[in-house]
């Protein structure tokens, strides 16, 4: 479709976008029909290049700092205009999409991309509505210009690339970045800012529902098991990464999944395996000479990805919504090998561990990560994406848990028997058995043992799980060394938590250093 000097393709189909991507040399077809694209040096998010425009309407609500870096409004206007001018003679792809599968809490967004495969990604991950913007809300704009090169001296950026959110003007600018995950996380950050004002808790979590309508949430950083554990053949998927919890129910913020592919196997992750087909975008996945994806190959990055629409999953909740959750699971990947595979939390402990967000960066999704696996505290299990102060989200979580009576569990998908490099990681079947026990209600009123240093209640038995694994000290050959590591972890929790202004009940719910 002609539009001035350039050609603009409005709401193109999957087949058209795959065809354009191949013709333009943006990617290649794999043997399973997916489109594989490479992102170059930036194979993960670039947190140091992410900004929020500091303007009067939102300034007082945002927790400014290294995560939410301020950007000058005038500099934003200039850069937005330069990017628009740069794209004026380019072939472009445009779609009208939505973020939020809820009739009240959705945001309409027009996505303009320079690359066909980026548009395919957006149409896979955002929601393609039957009727666009039925409540006639103001429309957000995303512009993604990966070949535009930023000049820090001219543009006010930190490097040759940037991601900037402007809440007042409802604009998201992505320039100089090929990693498509920046698009989805930008709109997640937008909803993370907007939803709390509407009494809705935005969550970095996956969600599924059983045949009886019981909803389970899985919070966790990338690589801790959100996508894998929510893709359960016995349950129906709501979504794998971003949700809102409103009074009365849970809804997916997205319309697709962005699954990690490293070491993907049909045996361990059949739902994800089967979803990778024509229409799926594979990011930085290496193929063999017959175009068969080699999911074990991390030569480009550990952070290999598959982006596919929820329609690629047979067992899904078609309206992308569910009831309020009976069970809430905090997934932590403990590299110290100290935490038990499952703990049952009080609501005060839930608030403590939600604010702490203790876990590991596993095959980090951020560029510049020097170690494949390192421990971290990530507030709300997603610190890079939450613009408001952490307490806002923690208070909303407590409110939702109390009003509905949800039970919260801490599940360790990391190491046992010793730290990373000495112990071994819990295998997926063990964690699945624990999750099965959680969703069935088996762990609601069971006998527990209290781990004093960690201040956690651990069940003495879980169906399908070796009882020796449940109390972590049993898996360490050197019990004194375990006690030493447990004390170190408790001290790390206490030190990290000192920054939070909370009630004594919440502060005392943490480990005892």
Swiss-Prot record:
Q: Which residues form the signal peptide?
A: none
Reactions this protein catalyses? oxaloacetate + ATP = phosphoenolpyruvate + ADP + CO2
Q: Which InterPro entries match?
A: PEP_carboxykinase_ATP, PEP_carboxykinase_C, PEP_carboxykinase_N, PEPCK_ATP_CS
What CDD domains does the record tag this protein with? PEPCK_ATP
**Which controlled-vocabulary keywords does the entry list?**
ATP-binding, Cytoplasm, Decarboxylase, Gluconeogenesis, Lyase, Manganese, Metal-binding, Nucleotide-binding
Instruction: Name a single GO cellular component.
Output: cytosol
HAMAP family noted in UniProt: PEPCK_ATP
Role according to the record: Involved in the gluconeogenesis. Catalyzes the conversion of oxaloacetate (OAA) to phosphoenolpyruvate (PEP) through direct phosphoryl transfer between the nucleoside triphosphate and OAA.
According to UniProt, the name of this protein is Phosphoenolpyruvate carboxykinase (ATP)
Please give the organism: Shewanella baltica (strain OS185)
Q: Which gene encodes it?
A: pckA
């Amino acid at each position: 479709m002609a539009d001035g000097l350039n050609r603009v393709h409005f709401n193109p189909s999957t087949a058209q976008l795959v065809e354009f991507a191949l013709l333009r040399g943006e990617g290649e077809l794999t043997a399973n029909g997916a489109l594989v694209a490479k992102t170059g040096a930036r194979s993960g998010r670039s947190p140091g290049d992410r900004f929020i425009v500091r303007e009067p309407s939102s300034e007082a609500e945002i927790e400014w700092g290294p995560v939410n870096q301020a950007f000058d409004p005038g500099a934003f206007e200039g850069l937005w205009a330069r990017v628009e001018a740069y794209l004026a003679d380019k072939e472009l792809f445009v779609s009208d999409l939505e973020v939020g599968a809820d009739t009240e809490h959705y945001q309409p967004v027009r996505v303009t991309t320079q690359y066909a495969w980026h548009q395919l990604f957006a149409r896979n991950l955002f929601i393609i509505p039957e009727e666009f913007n039925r409540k006639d809300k103001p429309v957000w704009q995303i512009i993604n210009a990966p070949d535009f090169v930023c000049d820090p001296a001219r543009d006010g950026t930190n490097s040759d690339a940037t991601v900037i959110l402007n809440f007042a003007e409802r604009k998201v600018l992505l320039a100089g970045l090929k990693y498509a995950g920046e698009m989805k996380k930008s709109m997640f950050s937008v909803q993370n800012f907007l939803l709390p004002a509407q009494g809705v808790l935005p969550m970095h979590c996956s969600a599924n529902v059983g045949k009886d309508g019981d909803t389970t949430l899985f919070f966790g950083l990338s690589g801790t098991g959100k996508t894998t554990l929510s893709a359960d053949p016995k349950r129906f998927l709501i979504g794998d990464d971003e949700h809102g919890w409103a009074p009365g129910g849970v809804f997916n913020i997205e319309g697709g999944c962005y699954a990690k592919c490293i070491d993907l196997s049909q045996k361990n992750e059949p739902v994800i395996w089967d979803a990778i087909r024509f229409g799926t975008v594979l990011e930085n996945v290496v193929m063999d000479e017959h175009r068969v994806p080699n999911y074990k190959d991390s030569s480009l990055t550990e952070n290999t990805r598959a982006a596919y629409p929820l329609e690629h999953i047979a067992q899904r909740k078609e309206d992308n919504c569910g009831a309020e959750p009976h069970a809430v699971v905090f997934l932590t990947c403990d590299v110290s090998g100290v935490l038990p595979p499952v703990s049952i939390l009080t609501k005060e402990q839930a608030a403590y561990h939600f604010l702490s967000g203790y876990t590991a960066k596993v095959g980090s999704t951020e560029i510049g990560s020097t170690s494949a696996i390192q421990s971290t505290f990530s507030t709300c299990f997603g610190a890079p994406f939450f613009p408001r102060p952490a307490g806002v989200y923690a208070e909303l979580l407590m409110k939702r848990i109390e009003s509905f009576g949800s039970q919260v569990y801490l599940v360790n998908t990391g190491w046992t028997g010793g730290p990373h490099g000495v112990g071994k990681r819990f295998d997926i079947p063990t964690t699945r058995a624990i999750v099965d026990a959680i969703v069935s209600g088996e762990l609601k009123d069971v006998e527990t043992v209290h781990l004093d240093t960690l201040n956690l209640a651990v069940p003495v038995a879980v169906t399908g799980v070796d009882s020796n694994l449940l109390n972590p000290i049993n898996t360490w050959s050197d019990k004194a060394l375990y006690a030493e590591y447990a004390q170190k972890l408790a001290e790390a929790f206490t030190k990290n938590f000192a920054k939070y202004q909370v009630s004594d009940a919440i502060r005392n719910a943490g480990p005892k250093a």
